[in-house]
């Protein structure tokens, strides 16, 4: 990559991502997909320092640095033939991918995971609400805690679905704008998240390290947070975080898909 002082900000971000995530290509494989509570895979020497530098660069990034004009909100409903989310590909190596997701008004990227991956998300315009979660697994080859027989949900689950329910934890739910620092995920912390556009369109830069690769155990899985049936007299503590939740893996929703669109910003060179 060019090393002159006139390099664009996105070029410097890509260069720093190369340093931060070098050697991360290849991941940890499918057998580690559910190891959300185990020790984190060892990273290259200097990883914390390089990650801090990358976070600092991302914090500076704005939509105009990528020649992206903020989309305007519309009161018209989204036509059913248009994707709710689009993606601008910027750059990718075996170690990381770099691109921009653009969400239309009132749309969401459903709850999903990032097996064995680090991620960094920096809002470029608009506001997004990010709910961060993790699966709670026993580790050591043991099965995760089973769903108590008396636990019921609304709507009710089928017997096969009950067998697939897994415990999880909702760690945080916060809103991010272009003035916010990046949202960070690791293989074992905040690895699942849902992203909602709040009061209008939004866009964010996304770094995933290493990129998704189903052949190497890094496929994207979607989840639903189950709503437990609570006694009427039970006090609600839904706002208390972190809190335990029950998760059910689901197929990708029919009303969610993502299509590509051209990236208008400065080119990133190897």
Curated annotation (Swiss-Prot):
Entry protein name: 2-aminoethanethiol dioxygenase
Gene Ontology MF terms: cysteamine dioxygenase activity; iron ion binding
Cofactor(s) demanded: Fe cation
Catalysed transformations (reactions): cysteamine + O2 = hypotaurine + H(+); N-terminal L-cysteinyl-[protein] + O2 = N-terminal S-hydroxy-S-oxy-L-cysteinyl-[protein] + H(+)
Organism (species): Homo sapiens (Human)
Domain of life, per lineage: Eukaryota
Keyword Metal-binding among record annotations: yes
One GO cellular component, as annotated: mitochondrion
Binding-site residues for Fe cation, renumbered to this chain: 112, 114, 193
Position of the signal peptide: none
Function: Plays a vital role in regulating thiol metabolism and preserving oxygen homeostasis by oxidizing the sulfur of cysteamine and N-terminal cysteine-containing proteins to their corresponding sulfinic acids using O2 as a cosubstrate. Catalyzes the oxidation of cysteamine (2-aminoethanethiol) to hypotaurine. Catalyzes the oxidation of regulators of G-protein signaling 4 (RGS4) and 5 (RGS5) and interleukin-32 (IL32).
UniProt keyword Iron present: yes
Gene label: ADO
């Amino acid at each position: 990559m060019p090393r002159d002082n006139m390099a664009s900000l996105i070029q410097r971000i890509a260069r720093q991502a190369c340093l931060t995530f070098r050697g991360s290509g290849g991941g940890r494989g499918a057998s580690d997909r559910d190891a959300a509570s185990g020790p984190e895979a060892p990273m290259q020497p200097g990883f914390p320092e390089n990650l801090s530098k990358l976070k600092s660069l991302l914090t500076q990034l704005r939509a105009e640095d990528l020649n992206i004009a903020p989309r305007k909100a519309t009161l018209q409903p989204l036509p059913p033939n248009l994707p709710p989310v689009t993606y601008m590909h910027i750059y990718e190596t075996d170690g990381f991918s770099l691109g921009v997701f653009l969400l239309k008004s009132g749309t969401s990227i459903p709850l999903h995971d990032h097996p064995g991956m680090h991620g960094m998300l920096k809002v470029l315009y608009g506001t997004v609400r990010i709910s961060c979660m993790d699966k709670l697994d026993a580790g050591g080859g043991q099965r995760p805690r089973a769903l108590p027989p008396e636990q019921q949900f609304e709507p009710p689950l089928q017997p096969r679905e009950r067998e697939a329910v897994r415990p999880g934890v909702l760690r945080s739910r916060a809103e991010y704008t272009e003035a916010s620092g990046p949202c960070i995920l690791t293989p074992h912390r905040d690895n699942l998240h849902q992203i909602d556009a709040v009061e209008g369109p939004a866009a964010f830069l996304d770094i995933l390290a290493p990129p998704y690769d189903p052949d190497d155990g890094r496929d994207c899985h979607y989840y639903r947070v189950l709503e437990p049936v609570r006694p009427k007299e039970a006090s609600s503590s839904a706002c208390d975080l972190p809190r335990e939740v029950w998760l059910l893996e689901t197929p990708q929703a029919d009303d969610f898909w993502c299509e590509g669109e051209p990236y208008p910003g400065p080119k990133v060179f190897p």
